[in-house]
Structure formats: C-alpha cells, structure tokens
Amino acid sequence: MWKLKIANGNKEEPYLFSTNNFLGRQTWEFDPDAGTVEELAAVEEARRKFYDDRFRVKASSDLIWRMQFLKEKKFEQVIPPAKVEDANNITSEIATNALRKGVNFLSALQASDGHWPAENAGPLFFLPPLVFCLYVTGHLHEIFTQDHRREVLRYIYCHQNEDGGWGLHIEGNSTMFCTTLNYICMRILGEGPNGGPGNACKRARDWILDHGGATYIPSWGKTWLSILGVFDWSGSNPMPPEFWILPSFLPIHPAKMWCYCRLVYMPMSYLYGKRFVGPISPLILQLREEIYLQPYAKINWNRARHLCAKEDAYCPHPQIQDVIWNCLYIFTEPFLACWPFNKLLREKALGVAMKHIHYEDENSRYITIGCVEKALCMLACWVEDPNGIHFKKHLLRISDYLWIAEDGMKMQSFGSQLWDSGFALQALVASNLVNEIPDVLRRGYDFLKNSQVRENPSGDFTNMYRHISKGSWTFSDRDHGWQASDCTAESFKCCLLLSMIPPDIVGPKMDPEQLYEAVTILLSLQSKNGGVTAWEPARGQEWLELLNPTEVFADIVVEHEYNECTSSAIQALILFKQLYPNHRTEEINTSIKKAVQYIESIQMLDGSWYGSWGVCFTYSTWFGLGGLAAAGKTYNNCLAMRKGVHFLLTTQKDNGGWGESYLSCPKKRYIPSEGERSNLVQTSWAMMGLLHAGQAERDPSPLHRAAKLLINSQLENGDFPQQEITGAFMKNCLLHYAAYRNIFPVWALAEYRRRVPLPYEKPSTERRS
C-alpha cells in the first residue's frame, strides 16, 4: 500500500540536503505489508470508480492520502448535514454549521509539519520525459519499481481520450505532443504494440498515424524523441549553446528571458550541442517503425523541422521566426560544427551552459525550478558524467515530484505546498473559529515562518541571471528556492493576519526584519507600468515573443506583469502598512498607487480581468476586485469596481453558481461552461469578489443563492465534490490544484457569514410563506 511521508529525508545520505530539515517535503513510499483488507479494498474501489467515470470527471479527488490522513487522525464529522430550500432563508446557524464542517475537514487534512499536501498536476507532458531520462541513463528499474511502473501505466490509461489520444492536459482534446510521448512511455514500461486495457497502445498508434505521424510533433517533442533515438536531431530547429556566451547588451541575451524559458532551453541547448542520442535498443528500432507513415530512413528531416500538427499549433511560428531558424540551420550550425570553431566556440558554450545547469541545480537542492527542467537537467548531468555526484544528487530528488492518487502515479509541477497552505490558513482565519483550531493555526504559522527563503542565490547571482530571493516564499517549499511574487504576497499576508491573533493561540510573531525582507521582494518585482511580475523583474522586450519556439504555449519568452500577482501584492502591502506604518511608507504608498492604476488599466471591456494562473476571468476578477477594495476603492467611487461587479452578476447561473470553461484561457474571451453546470471553486471566487465590492450592502440575494449552492453541495463529512480543474498557466495549459475544492468553498462561506447579515433564528413557517 502506498503511504505519504512528510518532511522525510535521510540525514545519512550525503547527496541529499535541505535548508530547513525538509520541511514541506512530501514523498510516497510503497509498503507491501501496509493496509488492512478493508483499507486495500477502499483504495481499489476508489480506483475502479475513477476509471469508470473518467470521461465525465477528468481530475482525481486525491483520495489515497486523504484516506490515510483521516484514518490516522481518527477523523469523524459530528455536525449533521443540512440542506437549504430557500436561499433567502439561510440563517446564521445553517451557515455556521456548514462552515464549521468545512473547517473541521480542512483542518484534518493538515500534515504534521503544518502544510496541506495535495496533488498539483494535470499536464500530460510532465511524466513521460522523466521515464525517458531514466530509460536512457539505465536507471529506470532502479528508481521505478514494479509498483511504480504499475501506477504510472494506470495514470496513462486513465487519461487516454476516447479517440485514443492524450491532450496537453487531462481535460484537453488529443494532441500529437502528448499522444506520442505517452505511447512511447507505455512501450518503454513494458506494453507491447497492441497492449494496454481497451487496446490502449493500438488506439494511440492509430491516432498518431491518422494525424500524419510523429514528424508532426511540436519542438519539445522533437527534442525528446531525438534524445531517445526515434527522431533525428536534423529534424529539429537549432538550439545553439552559443546562446549562453552572447554579449549581455543584446536584446536576446538569456538574462532577459523568462526564467522558465531560460531554464528549459539551457539543458536543451547542451543536449542539442552534443547531439546526444541514447542507446539504440531493439525497442527504439521498433518505435521508429511504429510512429511514422513512411520508412524511418526515408523521412525528410529538414522538412520535418517546420511540421506541427494542427491540434498542437496554438502559437504557430511567424514567418520571421522560420527565416531565422533556416539561417541558423543552413549556415550557422555547419559553421559551428567545423574545426576550429567547434573548439573555440562550441566547447566553450557547452561548458558555460553546464556551469549554469550546476548552479541552478545546487541552488534548488537539485529539485530545479520545475518538472520539465528536472528531467532535462538530470539528463545533461548524466551526459557530462554518468558517475558524477550531480546526477546522483538528481536521482534523490525525483521522489519530490511524484504523486499518487486513485488515477495512478503522476509527476507534479513541483508541488504547491506553500501556495495551498497560505490560502488554507487565510480561509481558516476568516472563519472566526480560531479558538476551535489553535493547534492547526500554530502548526501552519510555524510552517510559513520556517519556509521563508533566508538567503539569496549563492555567489555572484546577478551574473548567473538570478534575482534576489531572500525574504520570499516559493510555490512549494524553501528548498526549491525560487521566489514568486504572488506566493510571497499570500504567505506574507497570511503571516500578518496570524500575527493579529493572540500568541497564546498561534505562537510568537515573525521577526519584523523578515517581514521587511518580504516587502523588499515585492517592491523589487514591480514594473514601471505598476504591474507586478511573477518571478523576476521584466527585463526583456515584448517583441521577443515573436521568437517563441514552443508552438503550444504563449507569452513564454520574457517575464510579464500579471493582474493576480499585482492584486496579491497590493493586499499584502496595505495590511503591512497598517501594522508597520513607519517602514518605507512613501515607497509603499507609491507602489500601491501605481499597482491600482495598472489593475484599472488592464480591465477588459466586459468588466472582467484575464486570469493567467486560474480559469480564468472569474478567477482574475476575484483578484482584481480584491486588490481594488484593499486600496479603498468601492462600488460608489470606482468605475472598475462597478464594471467588475456587473461582469460577475451577469455571468451567475440560475442555480446560483458560476461555471467557466477552461477554453476561456486559450481563447482569451469568456466562455461559460455548458448548460447550468456550476463549479464550486469558481462560485467561491465570484462570491468573494462580490463581497469585496460590497454586494452584501446593496443586494445580498446573489450571495444567498451562491451560498445555497455551496451548502447543498457539501458532502456529509465536510468535503466538497471534485469537479473541473481550475488552475492554468502559459495561456494554453491547465493545472489541477486538488486542495482548491476544500479551501475556497470554506473561505467563501467564511466571508459570507462574516459580511452578510443573517438571522439568528430559524425562520418560522409564517415567514417562509
């Protein structure tokens, strides 16, 4: 039976190290002797139910670890269920009971170190490259036991679409990128050409061939297939490592790139520069014959460089980009491959690229910035030295990425421990039930205090293209090391809120100097236009997006400002200013003023804001209204507030909820979910947005209707049902935040109960009529 381990690290292992004793680390271990007959049966039943219902609900309910935690804590919900018939007759007692049930359940999900574990996955291109890397390096069976491989295959089967392919993410239509990767992954893990339940492999291969064959895979797929030896490097556009030795004044210097783009193409360029190809096994030779329409030896690789399936081509290359690739391919690459330039330039460039890879690995404790980079950097280290310590350190951090649920084993983005915990604690504080959960709040506060990054990247970090990180919070845990503005702002705000609760309940306050450092981080990430970026200051120019090589994502070349990050920063800085009015007062006031102007300036014509990190306009409108309200804007004195309220009120469904399709993200316009289907997480965001804008004082009936939906949807144990996933990134991809379904309904009910006047007595029969 699989068990989730918390803050687990072997102190005797010389290649595994941590900055704070592995706080927040979550890893899975298989114990063949664990579990009673009843527990094992419950797990199998959860797996069966998911598989049977997989085309209706695509995301897991994250049940395996929840079963474990609830049993370990002997959780039992004692509050009886209640249903609301008339939304206008919700009493304080009904709202409080529903809230208390949700608070009790959410509290029971807290880990011993104070964080809230949860799945953070969903893209279907995360896991196969890790399998490919382990296969190429010969470590697949060492790292992935038979039990691992069984669960990986389960995940692949569970998320195969009815047409035989796999989408970019678990809710998406089939793409060449993920269908090819997952087909090869199944074959590497032992399935035959026609293996898998329901003819999974044959149906996948048919999809690939019916859509033109694997020459139509996008560029990231071309890279991984070239590494495996089932594609030729000459079929990829150039990724010259000489990029890393360009003069810093050039606009295309890597220091000006978005950190994720920079750190993906860093190891890619190393592997491309080496033209590395793994061992050509009999399986690789078979795959060459299985995924193409023409014989492998007759493929026109030069033509293949520009091929991309229409199902994948979200961001097609502009003509100028293809001209650049052709020039590099025809003239530059042959030049750099010849003596003496291969010695003077290429070897030097490869050395510089590897220097950066090692630097990033060390400063993230070999977690790296994310899962895409993890497999690439690990492989690059092995190519440099198969027996080196860098590769050994990488192997020990693979488990940080793996997650088990009823739909199998998947690879996480890199964990959302701090992000989820900051929101969970804010929801619990908003409940006004703090006296009932002091231990939960104390553990959570300790987790946040001990997870703040306490140092900048090592050495001369500016020459390694890095920004300050001291005083920040990351998305996952402190060892990850990468500052993020919204993660910093939400954890910062949470620490400030907890500091306002008596220390005998939540523990001692943070050192003010640590709070000042968080202010420094937030101010450093604000651009001239008032917007706040996500990871680093915006250094590159917008026109560089014309060079986006990915085909499947948008706005990934340079750093951008975001409404959500800007709003989070406003709310945190305003609360800080209230508690510490004498620290950098003028700078903070100026920052807030500019940030408010930015939020107002990017509002859509319909009153919404585009969401970059959630689905989509509903998510970002909650942030937009929250930021403006924190800055003193009201429905009466601010047009943007009125427009935002109008957007939310006009998109509310007849059942009282809100439901927005994920297609809003790639299409960049509001698209409602089909019919009357509402999403409880999105309903919670909309409720809180309206509450920020004073809807309770004007007309609380939309809030009552939304609260009725939340209360009536709550399960008997205090949980809420899993619905469509609501996280997003890079315009075209979704991310499953499994904790959202508990955090946001609880938070919305807390704010509803706190801000909306509710009767204390149950309405009499006469009043109902």
UniProtKB/Swiss-Prot annotation:
E.C. no: 5.4.99.38
Gene Ontology BP terms: triterpenoid biosynthetic process
GO cellular component, one term: lipid droplet
Reactions catalysed, as given in the entry: (S)-2,3-epoxysqualene = camelliol C
Chain segments annotated as transmembrane: none
Record key words, sorted: Isomerase, Repeat
InterPro entries: SQ_cyclase_C (IPR032696), SQ_cyclase_N (IPR032697), Squalene_cyclase (IPR018333), Terpenoid_cyclase/PrenylTrfase (IPR008930)
Record bears the keyword Repeat: yes
Functional summary from the UniProt entry: Converts oxidosqualene to camelliol C. Minor production of achilleol and beta-amyrin.
Protein name as annotated: Camelliol C synthase
Classification lineage: Eukaryota, Viridiplantae, Streptophyta, Embryophyta, Tracheophyta
Gene this protein is translated from: CAMS1
